[in-house]
């Protein structure tokens, strides 16, 4: 997300992923696909079906999805119910990457890149340096962190 200094609103521009991979000196072979740029609070099940369809039909068996934090657990559940035999990691940022050094987005993306390579097939949330199974995590709105339900 970007910040419009005139209206004071956040808006979506282009994905930052290619520049983030370059900045992180990532040597992995990555195919970036932008499916949509929508606030996760406005995401519908039709949007989630587009994500599921794309994952299901991807040649890759290891997939990272960047997603707004408010409904990423809901999307993870949606994808898990599809029972694809792929490792799918969903990550995001509590503070948008465009906000600079205060953002956790760069760290979370790096964590997702590492975890997706070693986790067994399934759907996971990766935030704050940890991975969580899709059905054992929640966003704690009081602390601003994701936490295990166990």
Whereabouts are the PLM-identified features?
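Active-site histidine-anchored catalytic micro-motif
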Residues: 1-150
């Amino acid at each position: 997300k970007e910040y419009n200094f005139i209206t004071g609103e956040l808006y979506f521009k282009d994905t930052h992923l290619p520049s983030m991979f370059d900045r992180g000196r990532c040597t992995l072979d990555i195919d970036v696909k932008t499916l949509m740029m929508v606030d996760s609070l406005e995401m519908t099940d039709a949007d989630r079906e587009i994500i599921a369809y794309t994952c299901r039909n991807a040649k890759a068996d290891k997939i990272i999805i960047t997603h707004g934090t408010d409904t990423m657990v809901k999307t993870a559940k949606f994808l898990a119910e599809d029972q694809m035999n792929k490792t799918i990691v969903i990550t995001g940022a509590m503070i948008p990457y465009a906000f600079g050094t205060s953002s956790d987005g760069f760290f979370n993306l790096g964590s997702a890149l590492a975890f997706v390579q070693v986790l067994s097939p399934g759907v996971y949330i990766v935030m704050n340096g940890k991975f969580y199974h899709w059905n054992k995590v929640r966003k704690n709105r009081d602390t601003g962190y994701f936490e295990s339900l166990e």
